[in-house]
């Protein structure tokens, strides 16, 4: 195919000015070959197919200054600030990546004047359409023929047909183009052969000054970027949504296809054209300006020309409204997710769906799309390593072409792109090694933590196998619900994208109603709104007994009332007492009131600890009603990030974690007169640590009393731990329970429980049913199946069927559902309550006659492979089984149906549950105990000591984070970390934010990580919610994505309707705002100033890396990573902002691993390898090119010997300190000895040795 030069050449006026004495004639402007993508492909080959021709010609006015006008592309409406135009030839300077910039300047203020040394007298108006400043290397035009040859080959027939329409317009200029071309090349040869160059100039910058004075208008320096996919193999089939690099909120989707920073050009030899320009003239990084990743309200207001249109288009896109049902579901799930979590952060429930992660169907769809992109034309699959080889081949071809151009004389030199390389970004070789602190004496290997004590008697038993396999009914119902939701979506058009296209909108009345319910005012008392106490309703009587008695009369009918005086007498006579009473006997609500009435609150307060949040709150509410006082006045409660107490509080209910943290500030707990450890039989992690601490408090304070309550018969163990203290038994008000076992093991315990409940409802006398399940998914599946089968039964049965009221019970029970549980059902309906193990002891429900025990429960177990605590299903213990059966005998003779065999009860169940301290991670516990000046943790008085390896490994984790020094003591960083109620890595991240001057941003990220996911993903709006979420993506980091979400919410005045428009959990965001406020108060107490890093979010990524460098992974394959230290494979999750970008970072750190179908990294952030070496020197080091491995080994040996010397010095100091203390004690005793004078004693002697005895 011939070369058609008429498409790109333009007629220019002659300029007879001189430059250095040499005439400067008019030059043609050629369009350079496009820059290569990160994978070495032509990143804009497809984009150029449909580019329209530039209209008009350049006009050369006669003036001396060059005016450079930066007009903004439609793609980016924000202002370009911070541009630095030098007066001399500039080189590409690396600037840090910036994500957000705000500016209030208008477009008219964006013009700047550049005066160039030795400039000609012409004034050239240049209007680049990219967001960049002008570089010295601009696009040249000397290779236009080659470029047009490429364009001709890549043009489609349609674009060629369109191009022919303009041929006549160019016909008149054709001869002038050819003449200009001949004149230009002739002059170029003459000038090149002449000796006009000065010694200060070289071939490298030859023509650069010429270029800056040449007419290279719109065609030479800019292009119109079209929303077309990149041709790289990673993005060949990607949708525009999948490639969002810097999403703009409220921006039409057609303008959101900007390239990812990861998809920019790789360092490769790029030709410098005859004019001295390089391809990357329009790069935004030269001037310090980079892609904005967040929608700026001020920036939008400045672009008045486009703002109205964009707002209208953005409004059209977000016309999908949240229905009332979806809003209720959103608030319900938000409450449930927040109050479900324990006091710890790193807890993953493998069976619970995560809002952030999405459902299985969408994840499989995304993974399938990614797999398709890596299939060759012949059908064979291509790994990422092979994809890189293919990309390198293209890069080599490009270099070959550049060499040919060099030989032909069309270009004068090559420039190696250094746009993404700075001095510190050179290729780093990361060496991995393990350094052990000397205080552990080599007794620990961080990556191979010993297996924790598993709470299962026989892993090969039937119950253990069934618990690992899970329920088939749950999966079946999940798929059925998903199918139903997708069917409904077709005719639920109002508010959907299709509805917007067809013009189907909600009525004004519906919109007003939704807005009234959601609320559009963000400036509310978020602290008060977030408190659970504001939502709890007054408890209503359910049983006939409760409805017929007043609250005072009900108190007198409780079993504990009959032994009130004897109990108080035992408390007066003993400092520690163990109280045993069945659940429902009144010990939790009445014991604290009895102590208050007996005068124990005159000189202090009565504290009562609970293992669960909901128990602490609901019990405090009940006691405040019985004492007829407001909650928060005399009666209060305190849980993590929520304190509802006041100066008049005399009875305080709290979680055991809250009391544990109070021991840090007041080791003797001086403000407490009595502490009641309620539900001690559950043996939570904090409870066991409190036992050891309170045992020392009892020894120091003789006026302090400790009461331990338990619902089971293992009270003798508590009594022995505190020194054989008395045990007081409260007589129970129980009725006989008939226990029925299953004849064969149940393969699907959820389906068996549903069938048993239906059988009871049809055949048994009146009485409510209680079903014990393991978790949220199973409870919802059981409720769905029960409802479905009841509808079938009512429709198919000829006789009247009693209604069945199905109610779930979660540990995070929302306030509205809590009222339903205790309300009496209407029309004589039977209640069927589906509950977790919270109903074993923490909640008492009247009217239960039938209990269905599945025999399973979820327990928190440390998973060393994942490196975190996870909720897993295990068979329950015999003690828990007896406790469940006892729930049927509270109001009358009951029946317990056990869905396992009697043999399994006797042989496959443990006698009592394994304490949590023996099966979980101990990082926080070790930090707390160290702060209490307990040096030797292995000698701490635990009731059930955890495995020694667990303690040592937790100490090693803290040493890695810098909380412990080389000799095992707390560092300054460690002392500060203790003050924050956070996991150690999050506390480290927060304090590193202070050191790096970005604590404002890190504080927001930590707050967002401390609450459940803020993304709401209704199944019937899955695609819309995914699209809305992608607008917030920051391609380098999921952590920065969370920061972006919070900042956008803040910019929109914390509005609730804005959250609904963008599928965000408004309650979750408000909870994050409350947590942020709590942490901010702690920072003020520590006198830490709140500083922000502004738009430079690279510093924030470094702070994140400082906390999670031990969870680092390097790239290996298609979206597959391996842990840098263990080699364990882990994958980017399809919901991650880093997923499917086309270029994935070489190194990432992640918050935690989630084990589902694969090991997925949750909350990943890209990091630089030298950050890992700088922040985690005990694991990583960078191999310098001028050092050998032998030198590295010598250096490691020196560091190790230095730590050993430090440890040896500490031991010597300890020995000397002990000798000095013994000497002081000896002298003190000598002074105290009395000098007694008597018969036979030498005067002044201190020894009673009579002389007459010859002694």
From Swiss-Prot:
Listed binding positions for ATP are: 581-588
Q: Any one cellular component term from GO for this entry?
A: nucleus
EC number per UniProt: 3.6.4.13
Gene Ontology biological process terms in this record: defense response to fungus; embryo development ending in seed dormancy; gene expression; innate immune response; mRNA splicing, via spliceosome; positive regulation of protein-containing complex assembly; positive regulation of RNA splicing; primary miRNA processing
Motif extent (DEAH box): 678-681
Coiled-coil portions: none
Membership in a protein family: Belongs to the DEAD box helicase family. DEAH subfamily. PRP16 sub-subfamily.
Subunit description: Interacts with the Phytophthora PSR1 protein.
Q: Other comments?
A: Silencing of PINP1 renders defects in small RNA accumulation, developmental defects and hypersensitivity to Phytophthora infection.
Task: Specify the protein name.
Answer: Pre-mRNA-splicing factor ATP-dependent RNA helicase DEAH7
- Organism field: Arabidopsis thaliana
């Amino acid at each position: 195919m011939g070369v058609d030069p008429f498409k790109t050449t333009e007629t220019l006026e002659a300029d007879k000015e001189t430059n250095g004495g040499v005439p400067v004639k008019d030059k043609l402007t050629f369009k350079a070959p496009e820059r290569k993508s990160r994978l070495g492909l032509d990143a804009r080959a497809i984009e150029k197919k449909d580019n329209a021709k530039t209209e008009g010609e350049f006009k050369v006015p006669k003036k001396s200054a060059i005016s450079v006008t930066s007009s903004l592309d439609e793609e980016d409406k924000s202002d370009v600030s911070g541009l630095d135009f030098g007066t001399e030839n500039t080189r590409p300077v690396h600037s840090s990546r910036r994500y957000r910039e705000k500016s209030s300047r208008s477009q008219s203020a964006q013009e700047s004047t550049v005066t160039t040394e030795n400039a000609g007298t012409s004034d050239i108006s240049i209007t680049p359409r990219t967001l960049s400043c002008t570089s010295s290397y601009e696009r040249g035009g000397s290779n236009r023929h080659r470029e047009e040859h490429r364009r001709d080959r890549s043009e489609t027939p349609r674009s060629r047909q369109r191009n022919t329409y303009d041929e006549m317009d160019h016909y008149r200029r054709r001869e002038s183009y050819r003449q200009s071309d001949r004149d230009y090349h002739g002059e170029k040869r003459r000038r090149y052969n002449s000796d006009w160059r000065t010694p200060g100039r070289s071939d490298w910058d030859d023509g650069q000054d010429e270029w800056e004075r040449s007419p290279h208008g719109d065609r030479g320096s800019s292009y119109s970027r079209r929303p077309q996919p990149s041709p790289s193999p990673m993005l060949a089939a990607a949708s525009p949504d999948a490639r969002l690099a810097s999403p703009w909120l409220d921006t039409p989707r057609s303008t959101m296809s900007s390239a990812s920073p990861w998809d920019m050009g790789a360092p490769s030899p790029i030709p410098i054209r005859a004019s001295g320009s390089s391809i990357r003239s329009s790069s935004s990084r030269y001037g310090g300006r980079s892609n904005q990743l967040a929608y700026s309200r001020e920036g939008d207001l400045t672009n008045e020309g486009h703002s109205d249109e964009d707002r209208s288009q953005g409004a059209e896109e977000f016309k999908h409204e949240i229905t009332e049902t979806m809003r209720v579901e959103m608030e319900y799930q938000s409450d449930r997710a927040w109050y479900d979590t324990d006091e710890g952060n790193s807890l993953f429930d493998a069976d619970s769906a995560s809002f952030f992660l999405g459902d299985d169907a969408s994840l499989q769809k995304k993974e399938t799309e990614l797999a398709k992109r890596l299939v060759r034309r012949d059908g064979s699959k291509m790994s990422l390593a092979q994809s890189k080889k293919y990309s390198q081949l293209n890069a080599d071809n490009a270099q070959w072409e550049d060499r040919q151009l060099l030989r032909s004389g069309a270009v004068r030199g090559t420039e190696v792109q250094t746009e993404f390389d700075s001095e510190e970004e050179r290729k780093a070789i990361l060496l991995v090694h393990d350094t052990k602190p000397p205080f552990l004496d080599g007794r620990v290997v961080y990556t191979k933590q010993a297996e924790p004590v598993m709470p299962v008697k026989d892993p090969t038993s039937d119950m253990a196998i069934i618990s690992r396999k899970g329920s088939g009914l749950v999966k079946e119902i999940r798929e059925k619900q998903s199918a139903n939701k997708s069917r409904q979506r077709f005719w639920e058009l109002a508010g959907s994208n299709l509805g917007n296209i067809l013009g189907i909108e909600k009525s004004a009345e519906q919109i007003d109603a939704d807005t009234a319910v959601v609320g559009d005012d963000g400036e509310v008392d978020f602290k008060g709104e977030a408190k659970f106490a504001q939502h709890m309703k007054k408890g209503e009587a359910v049983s006939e007994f409760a409805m017929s008695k007043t609250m005072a009369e009900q108190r007198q009918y409780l079993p504990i009332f009959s032994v009130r005086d004897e109990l108080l007498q035992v408390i007066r006579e003993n400092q520690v007492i163990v109280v045993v009473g069945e659940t429902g006997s009144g010990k939790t609500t009445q014991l604290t009131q009895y102590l208050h009435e007996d005068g124990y609150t005159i000189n202090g307060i009565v504290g009562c600890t609970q293992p669960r949040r909901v128990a602490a709150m609901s019990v405090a509410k009940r006691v405040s009603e019985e004492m007829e006082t407001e909650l928060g006045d005399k009666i209060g409660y305190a849980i993590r990030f929520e304190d509802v107490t006041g100066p008049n509080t005399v009875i305080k209910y709290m979680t055991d974690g809250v009391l544990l943290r109070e021991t840090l500030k007041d080791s003797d707990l001086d403000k407490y007169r009595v502490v009641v450890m309620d539900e001690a039989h559950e043996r939570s992690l904090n409870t066991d640590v409190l036992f050891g601490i309170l045992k020392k408090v009892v020894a120091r304070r003789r006026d302090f009393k400790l009461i331990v309550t338990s619902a089971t018969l293992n009270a003798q163990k508590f009594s022995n731990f505190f020194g054989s203290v008395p045990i007081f038994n409260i007589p129970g008000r129980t009725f006989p329970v008939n226990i029925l076992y299953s004849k064969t093991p149940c393969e699907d315990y959820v389906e068996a429980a549903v069938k048993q409940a239906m059988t009871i409802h049809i055949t048994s006398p009146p009485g409510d049913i209680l079903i014990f399940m393991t978790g949220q998914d199973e409870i919802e599946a059981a409720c769905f199946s029960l409802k479905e089968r009841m509808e079938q039964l009512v429709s198919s049965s000829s006789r009247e069927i009693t209604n069945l009221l199905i109610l779930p019970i979660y540990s995070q029970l929302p306030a509205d559902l809590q009222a339903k549980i205790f309300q009496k059902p209407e029309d004589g309906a039977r209640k069927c309550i589906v509950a977790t193990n919270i109903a074993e002891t923490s909640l008492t429900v009247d009217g239960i006659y039938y209990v269905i025990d599945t025999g399973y429960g979820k327990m928190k177990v440390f998973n060393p492979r994942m490196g975190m605590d996870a909720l897993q299903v295990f068979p329950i213990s015999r003690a828990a089984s007896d406790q469940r059966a006892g729930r049927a005998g509270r109001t009358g003779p009951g029946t317990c149906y056990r869905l396992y065999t009697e043999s399994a009860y006797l042989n496959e169940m443990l006698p009592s549950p394994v304490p949590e301290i023996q099966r979980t991670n101990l990082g926080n516990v070790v930090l707390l105990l160290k702060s209490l000046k307990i040096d030797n943790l292995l000698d701490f008085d635990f009731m059930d000591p955890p495995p020694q390896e667990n303690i040592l490994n937790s100490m090693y984790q803290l040493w890695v984070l810098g909380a412990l020094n080389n000799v095992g003591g707390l560092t300054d960083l460690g002392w500060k970390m203790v003050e924050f109620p956070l996991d150690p890595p999050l506390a480290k991240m927060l304090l590193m934010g202070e050191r790096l001057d970005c604590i404002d941003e890190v504080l927001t990220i930590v707050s967002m990580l401390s609450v459940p996911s803020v993304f709401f993903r209704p199944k019937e709006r899955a695609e819309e919610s995914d699209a809305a979420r992608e607008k917030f993506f920051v391609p380098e980091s999921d952590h920065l994505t969370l920061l972006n979400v919070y900042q956008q919410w803040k910019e929109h005045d914390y509005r609730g309707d804005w959250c609904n428009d963008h599928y965000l959990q408004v309650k979750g965001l408000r909870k994050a705002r409350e947590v942020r406020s709590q942490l901010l108060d702690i920072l003020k107490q520590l006198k830490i100033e709140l500083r922000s890093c502004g738009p430079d979010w690279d510093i924030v990524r470094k702070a994140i890396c400082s906390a999670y460098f031990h969870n680092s992974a390097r790239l290996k394959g298609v979206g597959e990573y391996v842990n840098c230290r263990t080699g364990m494979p882990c994958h980017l999750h399809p919901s991650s902002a880093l997923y499917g970008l086309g270029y994935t970072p070489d190194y990432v750190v992640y918050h935690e691993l989630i084990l589902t179908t694969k090991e997925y990294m949750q909350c990943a952030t890209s990091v630089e390898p030298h950050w890992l070496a700088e922040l985690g020197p005990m694991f990583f080091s960078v191999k310098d090119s001028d050092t050998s491995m032998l030198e590295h080994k010598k250096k490691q040996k020196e560091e190790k010997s230095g730590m050993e010397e430090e440890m040896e010095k500490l031991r010597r100091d300890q020995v000397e300190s002990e000798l000095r203390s013994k000497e002081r004690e000896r002298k003190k005793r000598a002074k105290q000895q009395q000098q007694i004078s008597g018969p036979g004693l030498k005067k002044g002697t201190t020894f009673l040795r009579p002389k007459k005895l010859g002694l």
